Amino acid sequence: MATRTQSNTEGHGRDGEKHMIFSALMTLAIAVSVSITPLQSAIWQVETSQCKSDCPKGDNGAAIGPLQIHRACWEDVKRDGENYSDCEGLDYSIQIFQRYMLRYATEKRLKRCVTDQDRARIWNGGPNGYKRQSTEVYWEKVQNALLE
């Protein structure tokens, strides 16, 4: 019986090897998730009370997922092969947040050190949200969530 199993395994050679590698990579992918900073956690709290899945659509259906991502935000930082519906997942939402911050919340762009207030207000109000008075209330909510 052992010989038969061996020969079956040998007969599948590369397929068996590929399956083992694929399984190992999938296990690793599941185990590794995006780490969440206190600011991201606070924004998540403000946006959806830390909803993890099947989050309600916000802004009259214009924003989706745990971080309430608008299509325009996603379009700014998406990569080939990604879909807007991926924003429904927390890990992907965090990646979009990080990419958006890397693009818009930079010292070079703001011409000064970037603060959590800048990041939160940019997230809420777009690339120039850090300047908009309309994002001040949002920052207060995020700040309160940071203190909880």
Language model features with spans:
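Short, solvent-exposed loop/turn and secondary-structure capping segments
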Residues: 54-56, 134-135
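Alpha-helical segment that forms one wall of the substrate-binding/catalytic cleft
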Residues: 71-130, 139-147
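Extracellular/periplasmic catalytic domains that process cell-envelope and extracellular macromolecules
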Residues: 34-37, 60-62, 113-116
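Sec-dependent N-terminal signal peptides
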Residues: 22-31
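Short, solvent-exposed loop/turn elements at domain surfaces
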Residues: 51-55, 76-79
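Short, functionally critical alpha-helical segments immediately adjacent to catalytic or ligand/cofactor-binding
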Residues: 35-52, 69, 97, 118-127
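Short, low-complexity, charge-dense intrinsically disordered segments
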Residues: 3-17
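Short N-proximal segments of mature Sec-exported proteins
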Residues: 56-75
